[in-house]
């Protein structure tokens, strides 16, 4: 157990998948959690599960994000942890990638991460404490085939993480990234496998064979690392991009 009682976290994209798992894990460790999602019903559902605070906002809209940060501060008076989890992906050959899909990935994955960080960090600076956790990806380190746009967006997240870590260290704020490998949950597995079949890509069961641990990740694997980065157990860590791929990526 991590000592997160009395702390406040804001999780973007908290209405499902990895974001939901992170919100549940943090709440289970005693943290008060604001669940931000552009899907109002999803945010409210997760908030109800954990006794948290639901916020409806689109991370690509600065005014909405500013209001979300203000609402969180109005409710809890502080933000100790920011988890930039909101993201979108598209899988397929680079030359088949719709321009709209590329733009969406860049807009949400990197611009959204920047916009939310810019809204929250001044409050952390004022208190001279805080932790920011960005969701990157193993694809942000290796550039795997069939993930060109997604990979580009996650390389950018890692770069942003390192730059912010250097700028924020003197203010007592740590900034780190988690780089999951292949994460699959029940809700998304069917959609992923449909795309794999469409382009003749290796199916999930086949890809598992390339993972030394022998399975794909589940959202709670990521949530456990997020809780660690929220805690004082990681007090000497900043600017890190933590591989969480079951050995798929080793560096």
Predicted features and spans:
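Short C-terminal tail/terminal secondary-structure segment
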Residues: 3, 142, 227, 238-251
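Alpha-helical segment proximal to the catalytic Tyr-Lys
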Residues: 122, 166-170, 235
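Active-site helix of classical SDR
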Residues: 117, 153, 161
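Substrate-binding pocket helix/loop in short-chain dehydrogenase/reductase
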Residues: 93-94, 101-106, 193, 207
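Short, small/polar-rich loop/turn modules that mediate ligand/substrate recognition or access, typified
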Residues: 83, 169, 174, 237-239
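C-terminal helical subdomain
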Residues: 177, 201-233, 237, 244-246
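Residue(s) in the substrate-gating loop at a strand-loop-helix junction
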Residues: 137
């Amino acid at each position: 157990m991590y000592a997160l009682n009395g702390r406040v976290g804001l999780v973007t994209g908290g209405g499902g998948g990895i974001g939901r798992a992170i919100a549940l894990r943090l709440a289970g460790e005693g943290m008060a959690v604001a669940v931000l999602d552009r899907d109002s019903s999803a945010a409210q559902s997760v908030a109800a599960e954990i006794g948290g605070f639901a916020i409806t906002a689109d991370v690509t809209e600065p005014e909405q994000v500013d209001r979300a940060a203000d609402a969180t501060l109005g409710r809890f008076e502080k933000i100790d942890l920011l988890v930039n989890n909101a993201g979108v992906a598209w899988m397929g050959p680079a030359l088949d990638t719709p321009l709209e899909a590329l733009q969406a990935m860049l807009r949400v994955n990197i611009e959204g991460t920047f916009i939310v960080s810019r809204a929250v960090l001044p409050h952390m600076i004022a208190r001279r404490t805080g932790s920011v956790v960005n969701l990157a990806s193993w694809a942000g380190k290796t550039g795997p085939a069939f993930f060109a746009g997604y990979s580009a967006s996650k390389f950018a997240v890692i770069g942003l993480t390192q730059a912010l870590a250097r700028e924020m260290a003197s203010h007592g704020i740590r900034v780190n990234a988690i780089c999951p490998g292949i994460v699959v949950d029940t809700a998304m597995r069917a959609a992923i496998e449909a795309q794999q079949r469409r382009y003749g890509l290796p199916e999930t069961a086949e890809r598992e064979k390339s993972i030394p641990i022998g399975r794909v990740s589940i959202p709670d694997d990521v949530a456990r690392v997020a809780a660690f980065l929220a805690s004082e157990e990681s007090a000497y860590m900043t600017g890190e991009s933590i591989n969480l791929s079951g050995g798929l990526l080793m560096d």
